[in-house]
């Protein structure tokens, strides 16, 4: 366990250095602030254009639903890309995977550590987006001290699920040459459509709703909204998932554990096949 913790810390430090060394710290912090604010402006503009085009009155509850869902979706793109692009970057760009892989560490833990910096940056962006929404657009949040422990637990479970999905994709990327960026955009895009990020599942056809309810992140988005938005806001929107937070939490716990175990299996399988085929450190000049 001590070796895993040591590997995680060093990999997290390395990931942070690689993410932030392209500029001065002050400029990096400024960039980290401006990016989520700009994304929030784009979302708000889309919201106003949509309601203006349909001639419908603006709905503050739906705006809060959309805004909070989009804010927490920042974790999805950042965490997934930060997890499964490690193999591609170390093998193709920096060509250091041979040295790292043959060192006496757990490569699985190393990738989790490398993703930690992406999680931290994404967390900062989520906080900035929510604060900006409250200050600029009158977003109403209701964070009860009694809900904080459950919120921390839900956030942790969601990140475990995201990192596990990323590690499943990392196991696949052992055997692929140039599909990292396609996966980085395609997989989060699927979650964006099917997990009720911008609209409730009830807005989708029945068969598509079945796809959404099979994805753990759907329940994660539902719980994060339920824990930080006013109860009246959530009651005014039919999400199709019910209002039993403990039941939804139980589903999230089981599915996160299942994806964690699945990630170990797929990662080890991809690693085994890549070693057998001699593709661990094989360059594709891409």
Regions found by a protein language model. Name each.
Residues 1-286:
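Hydrophobic transmembrane alpha-helices and immediately adjacent juxtamembrane helices
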């Amino acid at each position: 366990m001590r070796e895993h913790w040591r590997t995680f810390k060093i990999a997290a430090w390395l990931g942070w250095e690689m993410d932030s060394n392209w500029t001065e710290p002050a400029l990096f912090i400024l960039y980290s602030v401006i990016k989520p604010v700009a994304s929030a402006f784009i979302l708000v503009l889309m919201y106003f254009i949509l309601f203006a085009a349909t001639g419908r009155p603006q709905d503050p509850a739906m705006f809060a639903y959309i805004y909070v869902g989009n804010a927490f979706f920042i974790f999805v793109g950042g965490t997934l890309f930060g997890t499964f692009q490690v193999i591609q970057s170390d093998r193709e760009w920096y060509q250091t995977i041979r040295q790292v892989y043959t060192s006496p560490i757990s490569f699985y833990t190393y990738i989790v550590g490398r993703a930690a910096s992406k999680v931290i940056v994404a967390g900062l962006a989520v906080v900035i987006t929510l604060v900006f929404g409250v200050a600029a657009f009158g977003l109403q949040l209701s964070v009860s001290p009694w809900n904080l422990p459950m919120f921390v637990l839900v956030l942790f479970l969601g990140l475990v699920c995201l990192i596990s999905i990323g590690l499943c994709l990392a196991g696949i990327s052992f055997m692929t040459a140039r599909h990292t960026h396609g996966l980085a955009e395609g997989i989060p895009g699927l979650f964006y459509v099917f997990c009720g990020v911008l609209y409730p599942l009830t807005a989708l056809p029945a068969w598509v709703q079945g796809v959404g309810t099979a994805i753990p992140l759907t329940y994660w988005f539902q719980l994060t909204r339920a824990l930080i938005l006013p109860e009246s806001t959530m009651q005014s929107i039919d999400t199709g998932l019910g209002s039993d937070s403990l039941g939804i939490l139980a589903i999230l716990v089981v599915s996160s554990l299942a994806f964690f175990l699945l990630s170990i299996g797929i990662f080890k399988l991809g690693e085994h096949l890549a070693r057998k085929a001699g593709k661990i450190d094989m360059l594709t000049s891409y």
